Design a protein with these regions (language model features):
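Extended low-complexity, serine/threonine- and proline-enriched intrinsically disordered segments
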Residues: 1-11, 140-142
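Beta-sandwich interaction modules
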Residues: 8-36, 42-47
Length: 204
């Protein structure tokens, strides 16, 4: 198994096994706070498989995009959704903070007409069109990354899933549809947003 942690042991991710790999063998993980990263690999002495660990990419976030250090900062670029009167309390839980190998975009978890909770994610084509084939495997999907109250309180950064497959995209309408490798955990309390093609007024 593989575990990643910060040098001061205040954050860790894992343990992971080969079962966490994308079908092509690739794997990505969430951001870890700090200047140093510790990788700990443990393998049973009875294992007959050879360990193969290839680190293809390392990136350092030069901005505190997850609020590790400044959790009470004002974000004047938009309204705090926690300050609304509850009209969109469900839809808020569908919004995703999408980390694409050091680039960030917003996205939304959407439902489908089969209502089978396939974890489809809608985002913009311009967010993913520069990615090389296979890089979607490293995408990290953060849920509940918003202030938990109207006074800019802490947001979550431990509600996440990594890995996805690009299912569809179109340049002119600027959309991209991803399918996450894993469904959101029940503890995320994620909401599947959606729409239909009927002429009925939407209900929120």
């Amino acid at each position: 198994s593989l575990t990643l942690s910060s040098s001061d042991q205040t954050m860790s991710d894992g343990p992971f096994t080969s079962a966490n790999n994308h079908p092509d063998g690739q794997f990505g993980h969430a951001l870890i706070k700090g200047e140093d990263l510790i990788l700990e690999y443990i393998q049973s002495s009875s294992s007959i498989d050879d360990a193969r660990l290839n680190i293809s990419t390392i990136y350092h976030a030069y901005k505190d995009i997850l609020g590790f250090y400044n959790t009470e900062s004002e974000r004047n670029c938009g309204n705090n959704v926690a300050c609304d009167e509850g009209e969109y309390s469900d839809q808020i839980r569908s919004v995703i903070f999408l980390d694409m190998n050091g680039y960030i975009c917003s996205a939304v978890l959407i439902n489908n007409t089969s209502y089978d909770l396939t974890p489809y994610v809608l985002t913009a084509n311009h967010c993913v069109d520069s990615e090389s084939p296979g890089e979607h495997n490293y995408f990290t999907f953060y849920f509940n990354h918003q202030s938990s109250s109207c006074n800019n309180s802490n947001s979550y950064y431990n509600h996440y899933r990594t890995g996805s497959t690009l299912r569809a995209s179109y340049y002119y309408s600027d959309f991209a549809l991803l399918e996450m490798d894993y469904t959101p955990a029940a503890s995320f309390n994620a909401y599947y947003a959606g729409w239909d093609k009927s002429s009925s007024n939407p209900q929120v």
